[in-house]
């Protein structure tokens, strides 16, 4: 088990898919920390559209410009992953007031599980505050244009998912 380092932050999520809002949060966090670990959760119960490997690869591509950001998949309890990474900070994004209740509950639970780790909430730029992965997936599933919400590589990955489902 690693010792918590306040200069290392973990930003967890399913990132199914990674959006411009997620990228904006990492862009804001990267200058604040020596190391930011984007933890891509396996989360089979959420029925992800993209495999864990594909989500990790898309996030790595989207965040490649940051030398202090690494992307890792995980399939353990978040508290265990945070400890494994030696992080002292857990980053969470708040898009709107509606996110707060859930995030507050999660932060409280994490405080009990990993009391040595602080949760830090960041808000995305206003132009990204309405973007969610679930909305992007639904728009893409129905053939809509998601290019304003995600990187081009994600647009292509979602197009491939839609195409493979149409052929099934």
Swiss-Prot record:
Record HAMAP family: PPAT_bact
Family membership noted in the UniProt record: Belongs to the bacterial CoaD family.
Top-tier EC class: transferase
NCBIfam families documented for this protein: coaD_prev_kdtB, cyt_tran_rel
CDD domains associated with the record: PPAT
Pathway: Cofactor biosynthesis; coenzyme A biosynthesis; CoA from (R)-pantothenate: step 4/5
Protein name, entry field: Phosphopantetheine adenylyltransferase
Catalytic activity: (R)-4'-phosphopantetheine + ATP + H(+) = 3'-dephospho-CoA + diphosphate
Protein task: Reversibly transfers an adenylyl group from ATP to 4'-phosphopantetheine, yielding dephospho-CoA (dPCoA) and pyrophosphate.
A molecular function (GO) term: ATP binding
Chief location of this protein within or outside the cell: cytoplasm
SUPFAM superfamilies reported for this sequence: Nucleotidylyl transferase
Names of required cofactors: Mg(2+)
Site residues, Transition state stabilizer: 22
Enzyme Commission no: 2.7.7.3
Quaternary structure and partners: Homohexamer.
The entry's keywords: ATP-binding, Coenzyme A biosynthesis, Cytoplasm, Magnesium, Nucleotide-binding, Nucleotidyltransferase, Transferase
Binding site for ATP: 14-15, 22, 93-95, 103, 128-134
Organism (species): Xanthomonas euvesicatoria pv. vesicatoria (strain 85-10) (Xanthomonas campestris pv. vesicatoria)
GO cellular component: cytoplasm
Compartments where located: Cytoplasm
Binding site for substrate: 14, 46, 78, 92
A GO BP annotation: coenzyme A biosynthetic process
Gene3D superfamilies according to UniProt: HUPs (3.40.50.620)
């Amino acid at each position: 088990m690693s010792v918590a380092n306040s200069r290392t932050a973990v930003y967890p999520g399913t990132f199914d898919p990674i959006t411009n809002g997620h990228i904006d949060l990492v862009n804001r966090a990267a200058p604040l920390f020596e190391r930011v670990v984007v933890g891509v959760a396996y989360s089979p119960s959420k029925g992800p559209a993209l495999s864990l490997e594909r989500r990790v690869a898309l996030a790595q591509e989207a965040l490649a410009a940051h030398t202090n950001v690494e992307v890792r998949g995980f399939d353990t309890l978040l508290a265990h992953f945070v400890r494994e990474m030696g992080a002292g900070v857990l980053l969470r994004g708040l898009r709107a007031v509606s996110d707060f209740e859930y995030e507050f509950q999660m932060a409280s639970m994490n405080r009990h599980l990993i009391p040595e780790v602080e949760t830090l909430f960041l808000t995305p730029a206003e132009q990204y505050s309405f973007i969610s992965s679930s909305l992007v997936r639904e728009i893409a599933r129905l053939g809509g244009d998601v290019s304003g919400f995600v990187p081009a590589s994600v647009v292509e990955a979602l197009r491939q998912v839609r195409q493979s489902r149409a052929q099934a």
